A protein has these predicted regions:
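A helix-boundary/hinge signal
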Residues: 1-170
Length: 170
């Protein structure tokens, strides 16, 4: 029962955060975020992913469970509750991938929960770092989707190699 309560509270907090972000998109800070997302030199699907991640509207298992589409929100890699923060930062596969890529994101050691937390904390990165960062995040999400649809899971090293290759092609 306590677990269901925590999930319900988390869903309400997430919903409030999405509304807060959506409501302040005219502010200078949010305008800067949107401009930086849309100006990154990467494929449109990666930009779209970044936009959805920044608004916390990725269809994670946690979000799908809140909408009563699925019954449990367990991560396919580690069994913990699957939120966007978990998939991108705190899951064992995500940590392994970021370590392999070698991007020095100091916030990642603090286990952030929101995509915008990482964006705000690392907004001084160079353009190439952001493009690689965006590509790695998209590859983590893409790997999650492939596993959810029955494909074999990849380890962090494979995801990092895929991200580097994809980034180099762009």
């Amino acid at each position: 029962m306590k677990s269901a309560y925590r999930v319900a509270v988390k869903c309400l907090v997430d919903l409030e955060r999405v509304e807060e972000v959506a409501g302040c998109s005219d502010s200078s800070r949010m305008t800067q975020i949107w401009k930086s997302i849309w100006s990154i030199q990467c494929p449109s699907k990666v930009k779209h992913f970044l936009w959805r991640a920044s608004r916390n509207i990725l269809p994670t298992k946690q979000c799908l469970m809140c909408r009563k589409i699925i019954m449990e929100d367990c991560c396919d890699f580690c069994g913990e509750s699957e939120s966007s923060g978990h998939i991108l930062w705190s899951c064992t596969i995500a940590k392994e991938t970021w370590k392999e890529v070698g991007i020095n994101c100091s916030i990642l050691s603090q286990t952030p929960t929101e995509f915008l937390d990482v964006w705000f904390m690392n907004n001084t990165k160079g353009e190439n770092d952001w493009e690689l960062f965006a590509t790695v995040a998209w590859c983590l999400w893409n790997n999650r989707n492939k596993v959810w649809h029955g494909e074999a899971r990849k380890n962090g090293k494979s995801i990092a190699e895929e991200a580097r290759k994809y980034w180099a092609e762009v």
